[in-house]
Structures are given as C-alpha cells and as structure tokens.
C-alpha cells in the first residue's frame, strides 16, 4: 500500500493517520510540538471544542469513539444569561438524543495520540516542524533548534498543520494556490471556572451583550472553560482593559453573575493570552497528487458554529474514502468536491457570531426559532432548522444547509413581519394552511 506522510499531529492529523493505517497504508506523522502525553497544556491556549455528528461519524469509522467517551460532556442547549440577571435555556433540538459534546482539545489530542501509537502502520515523530517546501514539493523539516531533519521519500503528503499552515504559505508563495486570511475585529481570551460552580453543567453558557460576549463550556472534571470575545480596540475592547481595576469593573458591570466564579480574575486575565480569530480561504488545496491541505490548513473558520474540528474530521473521512475508491486523482477530486462545503461552513460560522452575541436577545429571533421548530414538526422531511442540518445531520452537506437555510430564513422573515405598530404576530395568529403550502412549495424533501 501507499506510504503517506502527515504534517501536523493535532486532532485532524492523528485521525487521518488512524483511518489510513486501518486501510493498510503506512503513515508517518510529523508534529512540531513535543509528545502531548508528556507535556502539560498551556493555559488559555485553545477554545474548548464542540464535537457533533460529523466529527462523531468520522471517529466511529476510525474506531476511536470508545476511547474518548469518558472525556465528553453533553451540551443539550444554550443557557442564556441576560444583562438583567435572568436566564433562559434554549434546547439545540426538539429530539432528546441530539446533543453536542464539549471536549478539551488537550485531552482529545492526548487520547488520539494514544490511539495512533497503538495503531499498526502509524509512526509518530514529535519535535519535527514543517517550515516550508523544497523545490520538488517535499516538506522541509526542522527540530526545535531549527536544525534540518531528514525527510523520508513518501508517495503522498497531507498537510494538517493548522490555520497558520507553513505548507499553505509555501504553496501560495510559489503561485500554486490563492489564499486569503481574513481576521475579524474581535479577539478572544480564555478564563477558568473551577468545579463546584452553580452553572448548569450540560449546557453551553452564553452571556450575549451585543458587540461582545462571554461563553463557557463544561469540562469532564466539573470545571468550565470560559471565553471572552471582545473587540481589540475601541471604547469597549481588550485595549480598554489594561489594568486590574478596569478588568474587575468590566466583569462586575457586564457579567456580574459569573465574575465571582473566576478565581483571581484579574490575574488570569493578565496571564492568559489574547488571540486572534479569522477565516482562511484557499484554492486549490492540492499540488498535483503529491500534496494536499486539509482541516484548518485549507479552510480555518471562526469558532462560533463549533464546526472547525467537525469539518476537519469530516475532511478526513471523505479523503479516506476517495483514496480507497480506486479512482484516479483523489487529491484533485477532494479539493474540487469539498471546497463548496468548506466555503459554506466558513460563512455560516461568521453568521453565527452575530446570532450568538446579539440576535439571541431579539424577540423576533426567538419567535422565529419557535416557528422553525413547529415547521420541523409539521414537515420533518422538508423543514430542518439550519443549525440542526449543520450540527446533527452528517448526511447533509454544508453547502446544502446554507442554501436551504436561506430559503427557510426567507419564510420565517415573512411569517414574522411586524405590524404597523411594531408588534409581532403570535404562532396562534398565523394562517398555517398558507405557510404549510409555502414550505412544501419552496423546499424539496430531504
């Protein structure tokens, strides 16, 4: 079978290695960091990950879900914390068996490393950083001291080296692909909430404040990882929070119910890094059939839909199938077939930022959400809320979810047009026979 090299030993690279090795390929993984089983996680370095249907399907096909099960915490919906201190729980789905799962990136990486180590045909090489490409397209590898390392002669290379991909930058520099990195005006910073807090455990907590927000995801040990999303500059921004006093006052004013749950708040705020958020658009993702980008290296996205990891894991599953089907040009086919779905989820992730930070506070938004669930109950084969298509339906491509979501949103906008006095209709006041007909006329069955 083929000898394949994978650049990047994060979750996507490790899953890709396991999938390929199970088909009989020899796989070598090169990771710039030290073995995660020997290292401690850097505080505040990574947003907790949300595992959903697409990622779960890929993990199951690789046979690794059992190893991860104890590290997953189900999140059944959003727990909204309003400025007035009130709270509202909004379930993600009307189906009890549909949840997303919170998982620590460091724990996930360690478990996948263990699985890969035990998988026949996989070799892991730590402290091996890909810093670029040679003239013939093979990677350049260096250790932590920037010393050159030998590069094996392998049939194919897969780059899963993240949003800042050295491989993507090298391909862009030689004109093989076009790429753009688009950063948003908001950065993020993580804070730790220890176990024992009164926060509801099986929920994704959101403190929506319009131009900014705080979220918190549960961990398996009972703690929460909170993340503040805030503008870099301006009157309300990270730039305005340069003193302990400013930080304390900001949290007391905006997040009074959680400020006391974060020990040494000002010290954590000062110690944890402030990181940027952005999207990557690139095409094509391959260099002949020699080299291919997957995951964040090809299509990094902002974290507001919780799909970055799920999309990357779906990449792994689809690429594995293309490599196994015996047809020519699997890298080119992957690049062509997967691009529309990747572009769609990158866009939807950006759109979800506005929803999470602001729209969830709107009466019209919440009415539309109620109506969407009613339409789904009335027309389960025609109307599936966009969030559910993205999160729980791995049989529906991202591009399909985006396009159907636009039609559905137009319907909901029409159903909730305010009256002249600004009042909204109620569900009971709607002409349901009319709207039932509109659903079946505008949406084909799934």
Please provide the spans of the model-predicted regions.
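Helical element adjacent to the flavin cofactor pocket in flavoenzyme catalytic cores
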Residues: 103-125
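Conserved FAD-binding catalytic core of PHBH/FMO-like flavoproteins
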Residues: 114, 128-132, 137-277, 281-287
């Amino acid at each position: 079978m083929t000898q394949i090299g994978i650049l990047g030993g994060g979750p996507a690279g490790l899953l890709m290695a396991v999938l390929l090795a199970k088909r009989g390929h020899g796989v070598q993984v090169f990771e710039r960091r030290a073995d995660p089983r020997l290292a401690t996680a850097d505080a505040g370095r990574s947003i907790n990950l949300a595992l959903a249907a697409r990622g779960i399907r890929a993990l199951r096909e690789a046979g690794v879900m059992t190893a991860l099960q104890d590290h997953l915490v189900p999140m059944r919906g959003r727990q909204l914390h309003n400025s007035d201190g009130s709270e509202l729980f909004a379930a993600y789905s009307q189906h009890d068996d549909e949840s997303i799962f919170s998982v620590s990136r460091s724990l996930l990486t360690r478990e996948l490393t263990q699985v890969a180590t035990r998988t026949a045909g996989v070799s892991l090489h730590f402290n091996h950083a890909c810093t670029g490409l040679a003239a013939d397209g093979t990677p350049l590898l260096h250790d932590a001291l920037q010393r050159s390392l030998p590069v094996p002669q392998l049939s194919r290379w897969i780059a899963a080296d993240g949003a800042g991909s050295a491989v993507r930058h090298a391909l862009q520099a030689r004109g093989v692909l076009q790429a753009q990195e688009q950063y948003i005006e908001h950065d993020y910073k993580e804070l730790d909430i220890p176990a024992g807090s009164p926060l509801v455990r099986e929920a994704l907590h959101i403190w929506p404040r319009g131009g900014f927000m705080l979220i918190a995801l549960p961990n398996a040990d009972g703690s929460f990882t909170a993340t503040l999303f805030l503008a870099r500059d301006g009157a309300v921004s990270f730039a305005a929070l340069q003193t302990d006093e400013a930080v304390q006052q900001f949290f007391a004013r905006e997040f009074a119910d959680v400020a006391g749950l974060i020990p040494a708040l000002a010290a954590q705020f000062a110690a944890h890094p402030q990181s940027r958020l952005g999207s990557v658009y690139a095409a094509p993702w391959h260099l002949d059939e020699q080299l291919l980008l997957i995951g964040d290296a090809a299509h990094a996205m902002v974290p507001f839909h919780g799909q970055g990891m799920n999309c990357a894991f779906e990449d792994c599953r689809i690429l594995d199938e293309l490599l196994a089907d015996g047809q020519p040009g699997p890298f080119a086919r992957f690049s062509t077939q997967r691009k529309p779905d990747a572009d769609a989820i990158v866009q939807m992730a950006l759109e979800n930022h506005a929803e999470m930070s602001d729209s969830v506070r709107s009466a019209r938004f919440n009415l539309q959400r109620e109506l969407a669930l009613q339409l789904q109950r009335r027309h389960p084969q025609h109307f599936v809320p966009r969030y559910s298509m993205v999160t729980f339906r791995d049989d529906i491509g991202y591009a399909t979810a985006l396009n159907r979501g636009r039609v559905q949103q137009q319907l909901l906008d029409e159903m909730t047009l305010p009256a002249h006095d600004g009042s909204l209709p109620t569900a009971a006041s709607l002409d349901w026979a009319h709207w039932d007909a509109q659903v079946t006329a505008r949406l084909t069955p799934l």
